[in-house]
Amino acid sequence: MCLLCELKSSSNAAADSTHRWHPRRAFLLAAGAAAAAPALAQVNVGGSSEVRKLVPAETLEGSARQQYSQVLAEAKSKGALAPDGHPQLVRLHTIARRLIPHTTQWNPRARDWKWQVNLIGSKQLNAWCMPGGKIAFYTGIIDQLQLDDDQIAMIMGHEMAHALREHARERLAKSQVTSIGLSVASQLLGLGQLGNVAADLGTQLLSLKYSRDDETEADLVGLEIAARGGYRPEASVELWKKMLAANGNGGPGFLSTHPSGANRIQELEANLPKVQHLYQQASRG
């Protein structure tokens, strides 16, 4: 299982529902008023690529809002959208309130995001966060993995990190650049359809390394956000051990678009000492 944050079609996102719930009201979480003071990042993930600026953040976040609304509408039509007061949804909201104040250091735009957290009844082991802070969890990942609050916080922090680091924006921008560049080259060289095939392969190879780095970055940023929120850093390792048990290790990391479970655990364990004091400070506070 690879945790992704990308613009998904409403049909895929709301499929496989296993619960039916009554209609509910929208739930919004604002980051601005409760934002924590800027703090020095403890994990080292480097800077974001400038190429992402080819895709306007406002445009992408607007598209995300529309897609998110469609996902919720479809889930609601199937009775799969958790109502206000549902115990698992209350858990998610409580965790989100503790994490959101620590998001703005990773992206100043997050101060103005209208964070939303929803729960969809589905057997899928999945959770995601669209640009602009639109989060969805599926009951399958909580129930089947029997996640405690600390482990849920690690998933939520990971998904938030994808949005905060603008991975979807960067992915789309790089895709545009690659498509335009390879298309022009194919025409100039007269490669025709052969050029298109090569272009498709090249796009896959370019995205392979990018996506693996993306996931590692989200793991580490999410770990720090969760630790600052007062959730045990060790829960990140526990989570991925559960993932391995549920899904297998998926082969070596270089054969996947994301790091293998074993590689993720190793990277997380190496970074636990960097955030342990953040958890301790939050626990005392």
Language model regions located:
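A Zn2+-metalloprotease active-site environment signal
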Residues: 2-285
